[in-house]
Amino acid sequence: MSRFDPLKVGVMPASRTDEVIAALDGVFPGIEAVESVVACGLSSLNPIIHVPGCILNAGRIEYAQGDFHFYTEGFTDCVARLLDAMGYESDIAAHGIGGAVETDSIKEAIAGDPNFAKITGPANLKNRYYSEDIPFGIATWAKLARLIGVPTPVMDSLVSLGGVLLESDCGEGGRSMAELGIEDMDLEALRAYLIEG
């Protein structure tokens, strides 16, 4: 499945992609270049899988304290629909910046890999699936999507719900567009910046 294999690499600036891929190929055989560092970041599955799975299983996480199988017990069809909806939003944002759109089912990828069946859930809500993947994953992605005019109602909802569960403002965490140096860029300026630096 393309989301897991091969390892995707984005280069900043993208105009140096061939040079970087050539240098890395001997160390990481089978790597795949993507259009930009943003497209690479938006293709990360951790926030797409962890955040909806953890938010929809928060009660189970608190009760079981890690004694349940996250990817089998926690990933029913309704959870998978939310994963796919959020994945779609990140794909549309990546496509808007010039990246490829993934069409693979995340649930099928998880079900098709026996290694996922062994993984137990987080033991509490202080786990990195919440504390990192919400503010540094989907909250930052949603900010980027807003910058280029892409709505992210699913991501925004999950950031809000995560804030309630964690008793914090998850939307204020993560990276701001100002910290990334792209706050005042329109879509064309952002595309040019990603290619040329």
Placement of each model-derived feature along the sequence:
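Long, low-complexity C-terminal extensions of enzymes
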Residues: 96-100, 107-195
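Serine/threonine-rich low-complexity intrinsically disordered regions
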Residues: 13-16, 102, 176
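Rossmann-fold dinucleotide-binding core
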Residues: 1-67
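Inter-helical turn/loop segments and adjacent helix faces that build the functional surface
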Residues: 28, 73, 77, 145-148
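C-terminal substrate-binding/catalytic lobe of Rossmann-fold NAD(P)-dependent dehydrogenases
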Residues: 41-135, 139
